[in-house]
Swiss-Prot record:
GO cellular component entries: endoplasmic reticulum membrane
Keyword check for Transmembrane: yes
InterPro entries found in the cross-reference section: Phopholipid_MeTrfase, Phosphatid-EA_MeTrfase_fun, SKICH
Pathway as given in its UniProt record: Phospholipid metabolism; phosphatidylcholine biosynthesis
Transmembrane segments annotated in the record for this chain: 35-55, 64-84, 146-166, 178-198, 234-254, 257-277, 327-347, 357-377, 404-424, 437-457, 512-532
Protein name: Phosphatidylethanolamine N-methyltransferase
Keyword terms: Endoplasmic reticulum, Lipid biosynthesis, Lipid metabolism, Membrane, Methyltransferase, Phospholipid biosynthesis, Phospholipid metabolism, S-adenosyl-L-methionine, Transferase, Transmembrane, Transmembrane helix
Classification lineage: Eukaryota, Fungi, Dikarya, Ascomycota, Saccharomycotina
Species of the source: Clavispora lusitaniae (strain ATCC 42720)
């Protein structure tokens, strides 16, 4: 990087600013010239050691250093925070410099001379104060304030660490087994080294400009966006998040709760500083333009349209007292988490038995939740079961997501409530019936447990903020991409997803782990293990395979920020190439989806076995051959059948003409019936099953024609035969050759422009065979159906024919629901449009990548 960098003030003045040194080099490198302020800072830092020599009581030292640390930490977060806030909102520091003319050569005041001397001493004799804007010079002075406060903050913290470590004759080295002391020192050292690497990497990435909050004073040209490189790809705000793990490493080494509390105190104030000072300024300087912000708000509002335009219940957040499901959720939570354990602890004599009951309840509820949610998602992903049912019953597909959200949230609440209730019972009974696996370090366990619980809450909040309620409730499984804004057409890489592809896989069980750490019993460990296994299965074998199907493997398999940094810094280039996703567009097998592929194959094979007939079509035809009546005086011949490779066939709904021939003076009560071959093949000379009104008299004529149509026909595919019966009885005189009734396939297009052609086919091949009076596509179908004897049965019959002929599943009362909505004005044209819409939704739910692979196969 060039030493000369371009900057621009907020007034629009451009300038070139020279290279500056980092804090450590400036203060502690003896080869670097020290200004007066820098010498004062170094002196003050060294003076901290005087406490060790002037105060003999170590506890007093600890108290003094803790007080000093609190002072400097408050100076950091509230002192520097106040200055930066004023500069960000009002340019107060620059305006004070301008008002006092601190950098004006002609100003000979004491403060002006001190400030100018300091700047000149920092930058060297070649630096021209007047050639640089006031904002840059003010920043140089501000840096010295930062140097003093930050270094004093760190040095006083280290003094607290040392004072606590050497307390009671170097207590950090004894009082524990050797292995535990060694482990503590090693882990603490690793955290410190990692913290050091984070700080160094962050400084190398953002340089002094951002390290000293330079963007509060001026902008660096060609640096308009936030930098996401190095450690900034691994952690959000690494200086304030991972940049403080070293504090906890020092607490481990010092073996001191005092150091731990001080570290937590400092870290907490730093997060307050981030929230109140840094983030507002970052949003103002680097935030998205107003139209993009508005678009994000629109996406969130679009999300609400899938949930009745009201924010859905997530846990117990967004609780709405006017929503029945919320009330039930609250009652369930209070019942399982509070009421049952409290009453049980007071009224139960056998505490151990009750504890086992609560454990079994927690296990059963978690197992039930795992089975139901995973099952629903698998069925929806592979067979679109839920969406198909909603569309088939004329319900908006959006309702499927809303109802699943209620189911999902209710079951999740039940699992957490039963788990919490079990542990509340343990605490109320003071663990009388169960021993802890780990008994020591109670305060450390509570601290780490609460930290894990808070981590899960924060991660879940970030997930909802990044992917919205739509993503939180697996909206990709239920809603096609075309139904949402273009921003939903790709996986989110913002928020926590910038750093981790599946944050819930790592942090989704943190809360349960936290409770287990606080109350480490075997029951909790078993439930925690079950939770982890379910979480792993759901993400890797349910969610991931579906995401690949919808968005493509390349997009799903993109490296997260953490993985990029790990590869870059820890893996050789030769190994990195093995992890790269192929850039070609050819579909490839997914190594992590072998289980799902095997599962799909098993289900498809099972379904084919269950739906295939027990006896083949050819065998049924052979069984029906009329070998028993070769010399009979009676005969049946079927007219108008279409030839096929094995047996002639007709189509469902089309009238069938049967010619009969009988001897003279036969009974006028002879009759002909239509039967399934599979139902009658075991009895040749007598029919033992009912014809269900699919019959007609022959009359006294010796020959004639009987037409079977509408209600006298079967509406199922299969092999059939006609039987000639004698004298109104069930004695068989002749059986016709077998024939097949097939389903006429009607292709439903995906384009609305082809609705008229689809309507014509529906009317010709379905409605004209079932009802009368529907002469065109604009005539309400109720006109024809209302003339039938059983209106409801006709509605259901037509719906069944539509499902079988088009392949688009509709409920048996689909037409009834549509007629009710339109006031009996629903037409064949409307039906065609509705079928196209259903087909389009189901098609889009398959996912672009899945359909592309299917075509190639």
């Amino acid at each position: 990087m060039s030493d000369q960098r371009k900057g621009i003030t907020f007034d629009g003045e451009t300038f070139t600013f020279p290279e500056t040194n980092d804090m450590v080099k400036t203060l502690f490198d003896p080869t670097v010239h020290k200004s007066a302020c820098e010498l004062i800072i170094v002196t003050l830092l060294v003076m901290n050691s005087l406490v060790f020599y002037s105060v003999s009581n170590n506890q007093s030292r600890i108290n003094i250093f803790v007080g000093m640390y609190i002072f400097w930490r408050l100076c950091y977060n509230f002192g520097i925070g106040f200055l930066l806030n004023q500069q960000s909102n009002r340019f107060r520091l620059v305006k004070i410099s301008e008002k006092m003319r601190l950098f004006d050569k002609g100003n000979k005041s004491f403060w002006a001379r001190c400030v100018q001397t300091e700047v000149q001493s920092q930058m060297g004799p070649s630096y021209s104060i007047s050639a640089h804007p006031v904002a840059f010079n003010t920043w140089l002075i501000f840096r010295k304030v930062v140097d003093l406060i930050l270094m004093e903050d760190f040095i006083t913290f280290m003094c607290v660490v040392v004072a606590c470590a050497i307390d009671s004759d170097y207590q950090f080295l004894h009082g524990q087994p050797v292995w535990l002391t060694t482990l503590r020192l090693v882990i603490g050292s690793i955290l410190i080294v990692f913290n050091f690497w984070v700080k160094v990497n962050a400084h190398n990435t953002i340089k002094d400009y951002a390290w000293y909050w330079g963007d509060f004073f001026f902008r660096q040209i060609n640096n308009d966006d936030l930098i996401f490189d190095g450690v900034f790809e691994m952690f959000p705000h690494p200086m304030y998040s991972a940049g403080y793990v070293g504090y906890y490493g020092f607490a481990l080494i010092a073996k001191s709760y005092t150091v731990l509390i001080v570290a937590v105190f400092g870290h907490f104030l730093q997060m307050v500083f981030l929230h109140l000072v840094e983030n507002p300024h970052i949003d103002k300087i680097y935030g998205p333009p107003p139209n993009e912000t508005s678009l994000k708000k629109l996406v969130k509002l679009k999300d609400l349209s899938f949930f009745d335009n009201v924010a859905p219940l997530v846990g117990l957040v967004n609780f709405n007292i006017l929503r029945a499901s919320d009330i039930i959720n609250l009652l369930n939570c209070l019942t399982y988490a509070v009421a049952i354990p409290t009453v049980s602890s007071l009224a139960t004599y056998n505490i151990e038995a009750m504890g086992k009951v609560l454990f079994c309840i927690a296990i059963l509820i978690k197992g039930f939740e795992s089975f139901v949610i995973n099952g629903v998602l698998l069925l929806q992903s592979n067979y679109k079961t839920i969406s198909e049912w909603y569309l088939a019953n004329n319900l908006p597909v959006e309702n499927s997501l809303n109802n699943f959200a209620v189911l999902y949230n209710s079951l999740i609440n039940l699992t957490y409530s039963s788990f919490v209730g079990m542990n509340v019972f343990k605490l109320l009974t003071k663990l009388k019936y169960q021993d802890l696996i780990i008994t020591g370090h109670i305060y450390l366990r509570i601290f780490l447990g609460l930290l894990l619980i808070i981590t899960q809450v924060m991660i879940n909040t970030s997930i909802v903020d990044s992917i919205g309620y739509f993503g939180w409730f697996y909206g990709d499984f239920f809603i096609p991409k075309a139904s949402v804004l273009p921003q939903r057409a790709h996986l989110s890489k913002g928020g926590v997803y910038r750093y981790l592809n599946n944050p819930e896989q790592i942090f989704g069980v943190c809360g349960v782990m936290g409770v287990t750490m606080i109350v480490p019993t075997y029951d909790n460990f078993m439930i925690c293990l079950l939770w982890m296994l379910n979480n792993f299965f759901r993400i890797n074998f349910v969610e991931r395979s579906h995401m690949i199907k919808i968005y493509g493997e390349r997009e799903v398999s993109q490296d997260s920020g953490v993985m990029k940094t790990v590869k870059k810094h820890l893996l050789p280039e030769s190994i990195q190439k093995k992890f790269e996703v192929s850039p070609t567009n050819e579909p490839k097998k997914r190594t992590n989806s072998v289980f799902i592929e095997s599962f799909d194959s098993f289900i498809k094979e099972l379904r084919s076995k269950n739906t295939s007939p027990v006896v083949s079509k050819e065998r049924l035809a052979e069984m029906s051959q009329n070998e028993f009546f070769s010399g009979s005086d009676y005969c049946l011949e079927i007219e108008g059948l279409e030839d096929s490779s094995f047996v002639p066939h007709s189509f469902i709904g089309e009238p069938i003409e049967v010619k009969f021939r009988a001897p003279a003076k036969h009974s006028p009560k002879d009759w002909v019936g239509l039967y399934k071959v599979a139902h009658t093949s075991f009895s040749r000379y007598r029919t033992l099953v009912s014809s269900n009104n699919r019959w007609d008299w022959t009359g006294p004529e010796e020959q004639g024609t009987i037409v079977f149509s509408k209600e006298k026909l079967f509406c199922e595919e299969g092999l059939y035969e006609f039987r000639y019966h004698l004298d109104g009885k069930h004695d068989v005189a002749f059986i016709s050759a077998p024939f097949e009734i097939k389903l006429r396939h009607i292709e439903v297009p995906l384009e609305s422009a082809e609705a008229d052609e689809l309507a014509n086919q529906l009317r010709k091949y379905i409605f004209d065979h079932v009802v009368s009076g529907v002469d065109d596509n604009e005539t309400p179908i109720f006109v024809g159906i209302s003339q039938t004897q059983d209106i409801v049965a006709t509605y259901e019959h037509i719906a069944m024919l539509i499902t079988k002929s088009t392949g688009v599943k509709v409920g048996k009362r689909f037409l009834i629901y549509n007629d009710n909505e339109t006031g009996n004005k629903f037409t064949v044209g409307d039906l065609a449009s509705r079928l196209i819409n259903i087909k389009k939704v189901m098609h889009e739910l398959e996912g672009d990548e899945y359909l592309r692979i299917k075509k190639l196969e």
